[in-house]
Regions:
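Surface-exposed, active-site-proximal loop segments in enzymatic domains
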Residues: 48-62, 90-121, 160-163, 208-214, ...
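Conserved, mostly hydrophobic/aromatic
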Residues: 13, 34, 42, 71, ...
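Polysaccharide-binding and catalytic clefts of secreted carbohydrate-active enzymes
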Residues: 104-267, 271-292
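Boundary/entry segment of secreted carbohydrate-active catalytic domains
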Residues: 2-24
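Aromatic-lined substrate-binding rim segments of carbohydrate-active enzymes
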Residues: 27-108, 132-135, 231-240
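Short, well-ordered coil/turn segments that N-cap beta-strands
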Residues: 7-11, 38-40, 72-78, 140-145, ...
Length: 351
């Protein structure tokens, strides 16, 4: 049934029924409301790791099976996510090395979302196990049409493992320290490197003035992130599913080079949250910027894309969060479609 991606406009959004398992009547109510709203697709399990594996090695997929089945019986398809964007507390407690080291070179405590190291062997092992199990369980379900790999990849880790991978990245690029020193012009201020182990990522309390180092670090962060995406994609394939894969990008997110994701994605999707009625430049400028973002997403693979997230009302992270004006939600949806989106999806269905 993956062909629905090519023969229908997807309408729906993120749905997190794992938050409402204590109230089973909510699912029936939500399905009825979805049908009234002509919803034909929802994204599931994006932040559901703790509900899917409440304890290490204890997998509870029954609730997800029930939700996917019930939705499909009512003509609603599932974009199934891998939940790597937010790991459970038990994992951070037992394996603190999965947590990121920030640019002050301190390891983070548990919390937030993208607070995990893409290089950590343990985190990769846990992600592989989860993703491949989800693929085996649901990857060939007739109601599942697309894999939503992780969520809004972002950020960087400065742990010793990532630092060593960065040095390997530089060795692959420059081959010799002489070539690297020449490219970075390290003779200025006597910053010449004499051993690969001396090279560290640019940080506030370390080297910040070698522009070549900073550019290469950002390129490395993109490479690490794409590598992790491909790791998740391989896990899904190992579980037996050949459904297309995507991940939700974030407009002009300058910390990652999205053009490097294009070859790994089967289709592009992104999350659009314009500052309607809030940006001091005015809504015309916001609309122009959003139009350019839509065009950028279409350009990545030179094909239609999916609007994976937007809000029907207002965002909640600005100092001032104004509601959209009457008719503005429809206008934003039509703008996305006009620029090549094959979907209008929202975050989130219930909150």
């Amino acid at each position: 049934m993956a062909s629905i991606l090519n023969r229908a406009m997807l309408h729906g959004g993120d749905y997190n029924p794992d938050q409402w398992l204590s109230s089973p009547d909510i699912l029936a109510r939500d399905i009825e409301l979805m049908k009234q709203a002509h919803v034909n697709c929802v994204s599931l399990a994006i932040f559901a790791w703790s509900a899917l594996e409440p304890e290490e090695g204890v997998y509870t997929f029954d609730w997800l099976q029930n939700v996917i089945d019930r939705l499909y019986e009512n003509g609603i398809y599932t974009v199934l996510a891998t939940p790597s964007g937010a790991r459970p507390a038990w994992m951070a407690q037992k394996y603190p090395e999965v947590l990121r080291v920030d640019e002050t070179l301190h390891r983070n405590h548990y919390g937030d979302r993208h607070n995990h190291c893409y290089t950590s062997p343990i985190y990769r092992e846990k992600v592989w196990e989860m993703d491949s199990r989800l693929s085996k369980a649901f990857g060939n379900h007739p109601g599942v049409i697309l894999w939503h790999i992780s969520n809004e990849y972002s950020g960087a880790c400065y742990c010793p493992l990532c630092q060593e991978e960065f040095r390997h990245f530089l060795k692959e690029k420059y081959k010799t320290l002489d070539a690297l020193n020449a490219a970075y012009w390290t003779g200025f201020w006597s910053h010449t490197y004499t051993d690969w182990s001396q090279i560290e990522a640019p940080v506030p309390r370390g080297e910040m003035l070698l522009h070549g180092l900073s550019v290469d670090w950002h390129r490395f962060v993109t490479q690490r992130t794409v590598d992790f995406f491909n790791w998740e994609k391989a896990a899904v394939r190992a579980g037996g599913s050949e459904l297309p894969v995507t991940t939700n990008l974030m407009s002009f997110y300058y910390d990652l080079d999205y053009t490097k994701f294009a070859d790994s994605l089967d289709l592009v999707s992104w999350d659009s949250y314009p500052s309607w009625r809030t940006d001091p430049r005015g809504d015309v400028a916001v609309a122009i910027h959003t139009a350019m973002a839509h065009d950028y997403m279409r350009s990545l693979k030179r094909q239609p894309f999916l609007l994976m997230e937007n809000t029907p009302n207002q965002v909640n992270w600005k100092q001032i969060n104004r509601l959209k004006a009457p008719g503005q939600n429809l206008l934003a949806a039509m703008q996305a479609v006009a620029h090549g989106s094959n979907s209008v999806q929202y975050f989130q269905w219930r909150q």
